[in-house]
Amino acid sequence: MKTFLRHQLERYAQRLGELDFLLSREDIMSDMAQYRTISREHAEITQIAGRYERYKQREADIAGAAEMLEDPDMAEMAREEIAAAQAELVQLEEELQRLLLPKDPDDARNAFLEIRAGTGGDESALFAGDLLRMYTRYCERAGWRCEVVSESESELGGYKEVVIRIAGNDVFGRLRFESGGHRVQRVPATETQGRIHTSACTVAVLAEPDETVAVQINPADLRIDTYRASGAGGQHINKTDSAVRITHIPTGIVAECQDDRSQHRNKAKALQVLSARIQEKDRSERAAKDAAMRKGLIGSGDRSDRIRTYNFPQGRLTDHRINLTLYKLQAIMEGDLGDVLDALRAAREAEQLAELESSLPA
């Protein structure tokens, strides 16, 4: 284990003793607000300290087993004990590193996932449909619930734009690094010469705000327009003005929904998306300020960042941020995204660990 990690863990062990003492004091117990704050910190540190105690115990087990290696009768058992303890130490160190990393409270939230067709015309819209299928299949594997919030279909199938809401455990934390430009290289269905075309879509993953964030939008800052819902190619599918478009005047951010026959429900969904987009704008601005100080490996999640290429002739997916290449594109398009998302999380955790090391006193 790295020295700085061990020092940080020792500080947590010391802090746990301090918290135990504080929680035993009558003046703390009589102040419920302070008691709850200290109790929350105590619960968080107890988990870290418990895993660290187990880590030190397994280190001691290895030292004890090493002393038995000189005994022919005990050597085989000692080697087995050392191997088992070393394997557990690796796992414990990974757990401890993750526990020490800063937590983003938004990671546990539900999310809105937006896909927009970009360069490439009809082929881009078809690829947007393929991405939607990929993400919904992954959500099924993860046990998450998906619902379409708004969609604008293209004439040949696919989507000019589609927004879905995903509900489940740790949705935003798992999908947040999908934001950016997704490029596809393949022979389009409309191509008669067999030539490979390149087109692109943009994806944005937005944490769903809680109600306290949503109600902070001033109604006076909103312009709400209603219109008739329409299908592919502009064909009207509803004779009433049930579709809703909401504009946040100070920022110019727009959200619309026409998925439901009820104007009231469409308005509620559009407000949810609008709130998420406003929150994401604030998050992006903060990320841009951070990026001015350091260039993150994963990137800011801006739509303009080209993050990934899907090469169908080669069956290849490449994530350009972490130089990850996988030759299992068909499986990935069917929702097998786990390897990609795990690699992105590992890269981000490595970044955070380096930041933690540089921020701690020597």
UniProtKB/Swiss-Prot annotation:
The modification N5-methylglutamine is found at Q235. Its main location: cytoplasm. One of its GO terms (molecular function) is translation release factor activity, codon specific. It holds the Pfam family RF-1. One of its GO terms (cellular component) is cytoplasm. Methylated by PrmC. Methylation increases the termination efficiency of RF1. Keywords: Cytoplasm, Methylation, Protein biosynthesis. InterPro entries: PCRF, Pep_chain_release_fac_I, Pep_chain_release_fac_I_sf, Prokaryotic/Mito_RF, RF-1. It comes from the Bacteria. It is found in: Cytoplasm. Belongs to the prokaryotic/mitochondrial release factor family. Peptide chain release factor 1 directs the termination of translation in response to the peptide chain termination codons UAG and UAA. PANTHER family: LD18447P. This is Peptide chain release factor 1. It comes from Variovorax paradoxus (strain S110). The gene is prfA.
